[in-house]
Amino acid sequence: MAKEKFEEAMAKLEALVRKMETGDMTLEESLKAFEEGIRLSRLCASRLDDAERRVEMLIAENSNVTVQPLRENGEKNES
């Protein structure tokens, strides 16, 4: 089974949230949707963690560059 891509998982998660927000699901459907949402959320977080590690490894290969954490808006943290 091929790995699910981040973009695919995020699109599924967004669609699932929209469906749940309508309030038209039964309790059982809502529980199944919630479980799937948790799975997709964890998958997306894992893919983002993997991408962050890859970027840090690439930066570490260049000894003149230091790794700086990013703020939530994506800008460098200059502290």
Curated annotation (Swiss-Prot):
Assembly: Heterooligomer composed of large and small subunits.
**Which InterPro entries does the record match to this protein?**
Exonuc_VII_S, Exonuc_VII_ssu_sf
Question: Which first-to-last residue range defines the signal peptide?
Answer: none
Question: According to its UniProt record, where is this protein located?
Answer: Cytoplasm
Q: Where is this protein chiefly located? A: cytoplasm
What is the name of the protein in this document?
Exodeoxyribonuclease 7 small subunit
| Name of the encoding gene | xseB
Note whether Transferase occurs among the keywords. Answer: no
Record's GO cellular component terms? cytosol; exodeoxyribonuclease VII complex
This chain's function reads: Bidirectionally degrades single-stranded DNA into large acid-insoluble oligonucleotides, which are then degraded further into small acid-soluble oligonucleotides.
Q: Does the keyword Transit peptide apply?
A: no
The EC designation for this entry is 3.1.11.6
Q: Which Gene3D superfamilies does this entry report, sorted A to Z?
A: Exonuclease VII, small subunit (1.10.287.1040)
Q: Which NCBIfam families match?
A: PRK00977.1-4 (NF002140), xseB (TIGR01280)
Q: Which organism is it from?
A: Syntrophus aciditrophicus (strain SB)
